[in-house]
Amino acid sequence: MASQGTKRSYEQMETGGERQNATEIRASVGRMVGGIGRFYIQMCTELKLSDYEGRLIQNSITIERMVLSAFDERRNKYLEEHPSAGKDPKKTGGPIYRRRDGKWMRELILYDKEEIRRIWRQANNGEDATAGLTHLMIWHSNLNDATYQRTRALVRTGMDPRMCSLMQGSTLPRRSGAAGAAVKGVGTMVMELIRMIKRGINDRNFWRGENGRRTRIAYERMCNILKGKFQTAAQRAMMDQVRESRNPGNAEIEDLIFLARSALILRGSVAHKSCLPACVYGLAVASGYDFEREGYSLVGIDPFRLLQNSQVFSLIRPNENPAHKSQLVWMACHSAAFEDLRVSSFIRGARVVPRGQLSTRGVQIASNENMETMDSSTLELRSRYWAIRTRSGGNTNQQRASAGQISVQPTFSVQRNLPFERATIMAAFTGNTEGRTSDMRTEIIRMMESARPEDVSFQGRGVFELSDEKATNPIVPSFDMSNEGSYFFGDNAEEYDN
């Protein structure tokens, strides 16, 4: 992992703070989630939601989306300048589900964005509380990562659909700041850069003039973010080449795709945070919990504790399996879409199955779905153990590459081997090592070839009992070395469509 010299911890990024000590970080993260909770309670009052309706995850998501839309400056400005039929740029809303005479009903609500902003600021001591907004974006992003596949997006940019484990955070909006950049996977950054380069190839003026200068700054910043995720000198050197290119074109796209592939074995460091739905924070605040005083961390025991004591409900379609719906939301809550299923199952204390075996669709209900047949059930979001979230890719002993099955990006800091099919990955690297990046490419391939699937990552790290809040007694699980690792195996999920 890169030295902590200039880096801020995720929580500092999350709360926009400068360097703080652990207690200050815990307090400011606590203030952030407490503000989300207070906002949620106020919205439930405004909408006259019953206790049960306020615990419905679909209602939580609608309320979260409303506040994100109310603060989306860029889109608001765009909507005002390009009035479209039937869209009031000053209003935001969505479906709210209510229980009436033993049935669920959908009600579409509309609110003034100004009013939503007022309620949000009031819940956050009069501040804009951008950190809280980013936190909600990351929760939505983690939910998308667990729910949808990005095959189409990968293929469009010339990447291999099997690289899905690199796509964490691919649906995060551009405005998600440093906290958002920290949770983006290598593939996500590569895809953003490739899109940018392609626009430059097709549009001669993209890099020119005053606008072009801004574009260039954005390009270099994205390159630096991606460079910071790589852990080997050769990968970083290659990123320098891509960043310094005079006018980026197909050579850079090639280099980026090469780097993305290499990240399947030489994994990048990608942050993981447990971001929970707003209703969970609301429940805790309503029960009198003082987040700011108690302090809170997104990467420790706190989210597990919170989920242990929260009852959240979800609408269930006629042929969906409530246990599977629970698994989906559990994975989203812990940002574990790309984690090894053996590790997730052990921590959760229940078997976590690959997505192809889930009988459940996404959490959100489309406006044309029939409410007559909708039921609701409790989401089982509790866990048997807790573990610390990681921001490293789990590469063994410092700089050496370690194994990485074609789809694992570790979430939990727990000892395991990272099973992978070297033949499958290496097949993508035949030939092309000429050109200006040849020596780096050769070096990267050499490191990948020396990686062994039996090497152990996160040596000595274990899970903890939920009573062990100070993390004193690690329980190191032993996993069979079989390739049971990938959530995306035999995948049949829907595509993510904006």
Swiss-Prot record:
Record PTM: Late in virus-infected cells, may be cleaved from a 56-kDa protein to a 53-kDa protein by a cellular caspase. This cleavage might be a marker for the onset of apoptosis in infected cells or have a specific function in virus host interaction.
Pfam families linked to this entry: Flu_NP
Keywords linked to the UniProt accession: Capsid protein, Helical capsid protein, Host nucleus, Host-virus interaction, Ribonucleoprotein, RNA-binding, Viral nucleoprotein, Viral penetration into host nucleus, Virion, Virus entry into host cell
Principal location listed in the UniProt entry: virion
Positions occupied by motif Bipartite nuclear localization signal: 198-216
A molecular function GO annotation: RNA binding
Sequence motif Unconventional nuclear localization signal, location on chain: 1-18
Domain of life: Viruses
UniProt KW Cytoplasm keyword: no
BP GO terms, sorted: symbiont entry into host cell; viral penetration into host nucleus
GO cellular component, as recorded: helical viral capsid; host cell; host cell nucleus; ribonucleoprotein complex; viral nucleocapsid
Record has Ribonucleoprotein as a keyword: yes
Subunit-structure text: Homomultimerizes to form the nucleocapsid. May bind host exportin-1/XPO1. Binds to viral genomic RNA. Protein-RNA contacts are mediated by a combination of electrostatic interactions between positively charged residues and the phosphate backbone and planar interactions between aromatic side chains and bases.
Function according to Swiss-Prot or TrEMBL: Encapsidates the negative strand viral RNA, protecting it from nucleases. The encapsidated genomic RNA is termed the ribonucleoprotein (RNP) and serves as template for transcription and replication. The RNP needs to be localized in the host nucleus to start an infectious cycle, but is too large to diffuse through the nuclear pore complex. NP comprises at least 2 nuclear localization signals that are responsible for the active RNP import into the nucleus through cellular importin alpha/beta pathway.
Protein name: Nucleoprotein
Gene: NP
